[in-house]
Amino acid sequence: MNSKFLSALLLCATPLLAQEVHMKSVTEKIPTYQIGAPEIDPIFFTGRVYQGAEGYIYPYPLYDILTEKKIEKDYNVLRLNNQYVDIAILPEIGGRIFAASDKTNDYPFFYTQTGIKPALIGMLGAWLSGGVEWNIPDHHRASSYMPINWTMKENEDGSKTIWVGETELRHRLKWSIGISVYPNRSWVEAKIKVINPTPMIQSMLYWANVSVHCNDQYQVIFPPDVQFGADHHKVYFTNWPIGEANLAAEKMPIYLGGKTLRETPVLFLPGVVKCLSSRAMTMEKMQEQYT
């Protein structure tokens, strides 16, 4: 073979190799605060509620004992990356995206915790903030802090996908989410599949609970086909882009310009919504600043 032709082939192959998507399962240590053992027998119902929703959790156990004991715990971490993005998924904690960064500037575009320290927020108690929490069919779903099924798939177009999912025991709904990274693309894609194998109609929601490092420059761009907004326990709905519902917060003393949230319409502005600072702001100023 002509040496010049071989050199040209190698030069052409080098950038193609750099664009390859890599996927692997590794063991990594993460500082973790342990939780106590649950009741041996699952609790049917004790009148417990969580964030405005009924706390029926049977047949799941209740993980509501937090401890101050911190250990270095080994986790199975599923990693997915190309030359632009690097994703870490924890199948042992609900299949959540634990970390995601832009490799071009080392910026974590999802909020990344430095350790695992649960709080009593989830349906079953223990819950972790940060990253991306997948919620089907309820908010802060039952298995958010539990191990779920996972598999890896290499696709014909060169992309690679990590699928996480389960059969939810309370409603028997089957769901899976495929997190994909593509060659030479700087985004992460999530595809959702939900199957109702039961003979009954089931109510459900899908909520990707995304945590980010928020500042005055951060913007969230909403799809143009948004028609209404809902609170996170499927009870209250409101119009879009100007919502007048109280979002179940009539007793919550959140003040905007001297008014409680119950007295003040909630602004859902079309196109772009910026993160509001913690300072009080009148509705007139909000409309002036964000329109």
Language-model features and meaning:
Residues H22-Y60, Y75-P147, M286-T291:
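Acidic-aromatic substrate-binding/catalytic surfaces of carbohydrate-active enzymes
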Residues A13, T104, E166-E168:
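Generic hydrophobic/packing signal
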Residues L9-A18:
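Hydrophobic h-region of N-terminal signal peptides that target proteins for export
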Residues F44-E72, R79, S129-W187, D216:
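Extended, loop-rich substrate-binding clefts of extracytoplasmic carbohydrate-active enzymes
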Residues P31-P38, P42, N76-N81, V85-K103, ...:
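A contiguous, surface-exposed recognition patch within enzymatic or periplasmic domains that forms
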Residues N2-L9:
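Sec-dependent signal peptide recognition
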